[in-house]
């Protein structure tokens, strides 16, 4: 009896010690980057999540296929995919993908080499083929819709191909419900992203080759060019509209064959360009291609920015989380996530609910970044572990 009592006491003490020991441990912070292989092709471009669904649509331009990707509803991990040809043949040049707000659940696509825009019903399941609901032919002299966007009740597209009639480049805009109500704005070579400044309602367009941003007053029809100073950088590409403390349009400079300058910019209601530059040596030669708003209530104003090897192998393929001071006048901190496959020419970044997706143009891959027991912007920089400031921050 005494032995049994002693044995029970020892078991209780050991179990209690294990429980107490387990409770003393803090959860381990981790971040994970996972690559998901898409159907093999040479150019994997744009993608977007269909709102209120677990479906992501991804364009592959080199074979004009639309990949429908199903996400796990809890983890957001890709779990299934099906690919569908779009256009008359594999040379139709599927590129732009943009969810419609006017037509909820529907998505705009661009066929760059067919000179068309499509409104499609993607279907609620990954194996269901998209249904074309509307086709908009780009009128002459416009040619080659690249990226497509819906702003208010109008559809916009940057026409990236040189006009066969005039040798010039244009931005296309049309009423969503009446495409015959359209306008072509002459621009420089060549328009990519088109966004609205939320306070003024002015439209801004990045033009990559001629490294300038065009401003459009849709009321008067007047346009104005805002050249990028060569001393700052070149090749304006990515652009987003942001609200709240980040209000305005933000854009990136992708650099050239020798790399980039780690520079991005902001245009607010004043219409003036304010440039920002990455401070960390890792970003010094980065060509910045695309970006997304990463602002959170707890973390404050922030951006996700893609550094890409698209124009130069001297520019790393990386996803960068940039935070700002409360007034958004200077960069406060940077977190670098090097892509697993370098020289993959990372192309677009799209935040989901709790994870972030990145497309890799030349390796038919979709990468996903996820965090556990921490959040973006709180990861301590590995390259500074010997810095006393890091120990102070971690303590």
Positions of predicted regions on the chain:
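Fungal secretory targeting signals
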Residues: 1-22
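A short helix->beta-strand "capping" segment at the edge of beta-propeller domains
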Residues: 23-42
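A short beta-strand motif characteristic of beta-propeller blades
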Residues: 32-38, 79-87, 129-138, 180-186, ...
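Beta-rich, blade/repeat-based domains predominating
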Residues: 39-52, 87-103, 139-152, 158-161, ...
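Conserved beta-strand positions in repeat-built beta-propeller and related beta-rich domains
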Residues: 50, 57-62, 101, 108-114, ...
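Structural motif
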Residues: 65-69, 115-121, 164-173, 211-215, ...
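Short loop/turn segments that connect beta-strands within beta-propeller blades
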Residues: 70-75, 121-126, 174-179, 217-221, ...
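Blade-level signature of beta-propeller repeat domains, shared across WD40, Kelch, NHL, RCC1
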Residues: 320, 338, 347-395
């Amino acid at each position: 009896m005494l032995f049994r009592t002693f044995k029970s006491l020892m078991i209780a003490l050991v179990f209690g010690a294990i429980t107490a020991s387990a409770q003393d441990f803090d959860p381990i912070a981790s971040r994970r980057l996972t690559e998901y292989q898409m159907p093999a092709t040479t150019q994997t471009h744009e993608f977007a999540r269909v709102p209120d669904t677990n479906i992501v649509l991804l364009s592959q331009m080199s074979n004009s296929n639309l990949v429908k990707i199903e996400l796990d509803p809890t983890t957001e991990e890709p779990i299934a995919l099906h690919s569908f040809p779009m256009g008359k043949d594999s040379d139709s040049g599927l590129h732009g993908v943009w969810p419609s707000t006017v037509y909820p659940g529907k998505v705009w696509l661009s066929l760059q080499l067919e000179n068309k825009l499509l409104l499609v019903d993607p279907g609620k399941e990954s194996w269901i083929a998209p249904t074309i609901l509307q086709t908009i032919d780009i009128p002459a002299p416009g040619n080659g819709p690249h990226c497509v966007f819906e702003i208010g009740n109008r559809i916009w597209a940057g026409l990236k191909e040189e006009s066969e009639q005039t040798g010039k480049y244009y931005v296309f805009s049309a009423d969503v419900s009446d495409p015959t109500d359209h306008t072509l704005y002459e621009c420089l070579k060549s328009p990519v992203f088109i966004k609205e400044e939320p306070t003024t309602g002015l439209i801004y367009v990045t033009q990559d080759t001629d490294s300038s941003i065009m401003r459009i007053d849709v009321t008067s029809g007047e346009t104005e060019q805002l050249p990028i100073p060569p001393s700052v950088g070149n090749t304006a590409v990515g652009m987003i509209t942001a609200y709240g403390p980040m209000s305005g349009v933000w854009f990136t400079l992708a650099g050239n064959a020798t790399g980039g300058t780690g520079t991005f910019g902001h245009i607010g209601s004043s219409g003036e360009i304010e440039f920002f530059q990455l401070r960390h040596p890792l970003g010094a030669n980065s060509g910045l291609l695309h970006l997304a708003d990463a602002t959170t209530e707890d973390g404050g104003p922030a951006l996700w920015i893609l550094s890409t090897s698209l124009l130069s192998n001297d520019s790393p393929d990386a996803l960068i989380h940039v935070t700002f001071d409360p007034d958004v006048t200077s960069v406060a901190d940077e977190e670098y996530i090097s892509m697993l496959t370098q020289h993959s020419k990372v192309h677009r970044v799209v935040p989901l609910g709790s994870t972030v997706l990145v497309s890799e143009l030349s390796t038919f891959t979709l990468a996903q970044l996820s965090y556990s027991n921490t959040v973006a912007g709180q990861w301590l920089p590995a390259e500074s572990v010997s810095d006393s400031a890091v120990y102070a921050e971690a303590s």
